[in-house]
Amino acid sequence: VYKRQTYSQAVSAGGFLYTSGQVGINPATGEMVSNDVKPQCLQVLKNILAILEAKNLSLVNIVKLNVYLKDLNDFSILNETFIEFFGKTNFPARSTVEVAGLPLGARVEIDCIAIES
């Protein structure tokens, strides 16, 4: 998504797809969608879905998400956004941690592990 990246968006290994961390960059503009965590989170999930779809996968293939929040006080907003995006059941496993900083001033970054079968 970010034009100056020095990494792969995703790598397949051992029947799994591992994505790099995604931030709330709109791929069409190369800009952060908002300074607010909710629009950033939605864009991150859309970016992950686009990577999955490029590999003929979908949200049901996700087995684990690692979430990095700039402020753990945004945890409830994160949960609300996940319900909107995934529905109310069958969430993937998830770890969420607070971090000191994220690329491009992002408030949330998420990476994903998805099964390829």
Locations of regions flagged by a protein language model:
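Short, polar/acidic, helix-capping and beta-turn segments at strand->helix junctions
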Residues: 3-117
